[in-house]
């Protein structure tokens, strides 16, 4: 194309609009376009230092001798000049693209390092320019061996006649890059995008898409990747977990398990291993009730549901016989909302009882604490049952947290009897469907009935301290006191002091025996009364003078036999 060096220099002067090569000033237009190429070059900030091999670099070296004197400063570097094919075309007014590559990065300010790939075929003697010149058309030409042998740095110009425009490209390389380029020619990769009509410079993010060509699916063996495709280059294959995981238990629309999860799962429906309940072939279980725990019904239709008014099972609040809970008053704690049989004090009295048996009572009376806060108004000095302000929840009535009385065995037995009678009333009304089941021992634990033994009455020592002993003693003393008074009055009537006025009166004549049995009954009563009087007289003889005692002796009458 250019036979002489003079023609080459003349063309170079026309290209750069320079009169002499000794001019050290930098053209402002060239500097502007150079900065624009650096700024708009793709993946400038995303380039990594790991991708150093096989890539072109765009650098801006500060100094006045950037264009013409850049190669003279480094004479030991080998220069590669890309020559484009000749054809008739017009020279474009656009600024040429200058690509500078330098192995040493000490003086560089802007650098872009991207992997370089060469096409496997040379169509009409064209080669790839490099990923840095995305804003320029694809221009390439076979490199001549004459220019490779030259070691002196020379500026070369080229023309591209595709589309009727010329685009000048200046490529400066070092000797180390030529060796890497020769190695990379041996490893040639053909991509689908190169075979299509769309060229590489028309695609955005081409550098990222190049790596996607190495993705392979459903691998069964292993493959060693080349160094150009990745730095690892290690042998890899499908993980053993992927092979061992037998993921066949899933619906066609959604996978039920991941490959790393354990397949030894237990089904909640059939209690077998290997599948989940949603994939179980056995029909699903019926729902369980939260009240009775049986399957086949829900809480609303449970036969053992309980009432919120009387707290008994079998019916709801609307069907309850008793009055509403807000109209009830407890005679045990004097609180509204319940009766004595459902008083919370019943279970609250077992706060000291640990073992089965009688309820333990505290030795000292535990009163209310000095520092008390109300949970309704959050004020100090009173509890919720003493609060006079409006309730936060009007449906629930307050109760006292203190224990006023402790139950005895008699009270517990009576309360159980009352609950049984209440259950019978509900059964008659048809509100309680479940039957009462008493505790029955199993046949294994059942024992033959023991012989009945005589009940031994407790001795006097054992009786001491009971309430009945005190009551019996009081009644005995009262009876003795009454007997003493009655005995003294009878003695004075039988044994008067002095001669009373009634003694002068004549005695009435006795009646004769009529032959009836009524007389015998009267005589028996009279005899018993006389015996009682004599006993009382002996006891009270010390209180009466012996001289004044007149003992009346009567003759015993012989009983007549009735013929």
Swiss-Prot record:
Alphabetical keyword list: Metal-binding, Nucleus, Repeat, Zinc, Zinc-finger
Polar residues composition bias: residue spans: 133-142
Spans annotated as Disordered: 41-64, 133-157, 443-494
Zinc finger (CCHC-type) in chain: 265-282, 287-304, 305-322, 328-345, 372-389
Biological processes per GO annotation: nuclear mRNA surveillance of mRNA 3'-end processing; nuclear polyadenylation-dependent CUT catabolic process; nuclear polyadenylation-dependent rRNA catabolic process; nuclear polyadenylation-dependent snoRNA catabolic process; nuclear polyadenylation-dependent snRNA catabolic process; TRAMP-dependent tRNA surveillance pathway
GO cellular component, one term: TRAMP complex
PROSITE patterns associated with the record: ZF_CCHC
Keyword DNA damage in annotation: no
GO molecular function (one): zinc ion binding
Source organism, top-level taxon: Eukaryota
Main location: nucleus
Biased segments, Basic residues type: 449-463, 477-486
InterPro entries the UniProt entry points to: TRAMP_AT-DNA-binding, Znf_CCHC, Znf_CCHC_sf
Biased composition (Basic and acidic residues): 464-476
Signal peptide span: none
Compartments reported by the entry: Nucleus, Nucleolus
Residue stretches of biased makeup (Low complexity): 143-157
Quaternary context: Component of a nucleolar TRAMP-like complex, an ATP-dependent exosome regulatory complex consisting of a helicase (MTREX), an oligadenylate polymerase (PAPD5 or PAPD7), and a substrate specific RNA-binding factor (ZCCHC7 or ZCCHC8). Several TRAMP-like complexes exist with specific compositions and are associated with nuclear, or nucleolar RNA exosomes.
PANTHER family membership: ZINC FINGER CCHC DOMAIN-CONTAINING PROTEIN 7
Protein name as catalogued: Zinc finger CCHC domain-containing protein 7
Source species of the chain: Xenopus laevis
């Amino acid at each position: 194309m250019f036979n002489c060096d003079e023609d080459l220099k003349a063309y170079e002067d026309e290209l750069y609009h320079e009169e002499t090569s000794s001019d050290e000033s930098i053209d402002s237009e060239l500097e502007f376009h150079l900065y624009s190429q650096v700024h708009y070059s793709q993946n400038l900030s995303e380039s990594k230092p790991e991708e150093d091999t096989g890539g072109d670099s765009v650098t801006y070296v500060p100094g006045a001798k950037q264009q013409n004197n850049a190669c003279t400063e480094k004479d030991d570097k080998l220069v590669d000049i890309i020559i484009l094919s000749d054809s008739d075309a017009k020279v474009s007014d656009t600024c040429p693209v200058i690509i500078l590559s330098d192995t040493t990065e000490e003086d560089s300010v802007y650098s872009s390092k991207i992997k370089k790939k060469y096409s496997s075929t040379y169509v009409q003697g064209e080669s790839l320019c490099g990923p840095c010149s995305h804003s320029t058309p694809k221009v390439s030409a076979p490199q001549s061996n004459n220019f490779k042998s030259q070691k002196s740095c020379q500026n070369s110009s080229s023309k591209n006649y595709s589309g009727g425009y010329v685009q000048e490209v200046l490529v400066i390389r070092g000797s180390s890059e030529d060796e890497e380029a020769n190695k990379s020619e041996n490893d040639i990769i053909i991509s689908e995008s190169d075979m299509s009509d769309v060229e590489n410079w028309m695609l955005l993010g081409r550098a990222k898409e190049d790596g996607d060509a190495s993705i392979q699916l459903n691998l069964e063996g292993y493959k060693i990747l080349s160094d150009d495709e990745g730095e690892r280059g290690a042998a890899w294959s499908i993980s053993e977990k992927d092979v061992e995981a037998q993921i066949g238990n899933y619906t066609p629309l959604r996978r039920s398990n991941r490959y790393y999860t354990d397949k030894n799962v237990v089904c909640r429906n059939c209690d077998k291993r290997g599948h989940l309940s949603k994939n179980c072939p056995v029909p699903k279980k019926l729902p369980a009730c939260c009240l009775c725990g049986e399957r086949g019904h829900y809480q609303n239709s449970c036969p053992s549901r309980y009432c919120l008014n009387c707290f008994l099972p079998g019916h709801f609040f609307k069907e309850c016989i008793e009055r509403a809970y807000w109209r009830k008053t407890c005679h045990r704690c004097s609180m509204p909302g319940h009766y004595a049989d459902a008083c919370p004090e019943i279970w609250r009295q077992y706060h000291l009882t640990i073992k089965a048996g009688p309820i333990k009572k505290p030795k000292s009376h535990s009163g209310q604490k000095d520092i008390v806060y109300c949970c309704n108004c959050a004020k100090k000095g009173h509890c919720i049952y003493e609060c006079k302000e409006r309730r936060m929840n009007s449906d629930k009535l307050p109760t006292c947290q203190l224990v006023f009385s402790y139950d005895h065995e008699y009270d517990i037995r009576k309360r159980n009897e009352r609950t049984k009678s209440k259950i019978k009333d509900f059964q008659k009304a048809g509100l309680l469907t479940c039957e009462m089941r008493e505790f029955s021992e199993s046949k294994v634990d059942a024992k033959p009935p023991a012989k009945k033994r005589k009940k031994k009455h407790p001795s006097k020592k054992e009786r001491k301290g009971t309430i009945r002993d005190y009551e019996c003693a009081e009644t005995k003393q009262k009876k003795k006191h009454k007997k003493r008074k009655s005995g003294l009055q009878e003695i004075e009537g039988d044994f008067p002091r002095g001669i009373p006025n009634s003694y002068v009166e004549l005695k009435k004549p006795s009646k004769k025996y009529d032959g009836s049995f009524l007389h015998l009954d009267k005589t028996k009563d009279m005899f018993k009364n006389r015996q009682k009087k004599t006993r009382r007289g002996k006891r009270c003889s010390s209180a009466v003078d012996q001289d004044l005692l007149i003992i009346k002796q009567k003759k015993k009458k012989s009983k007549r036999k009735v013929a």
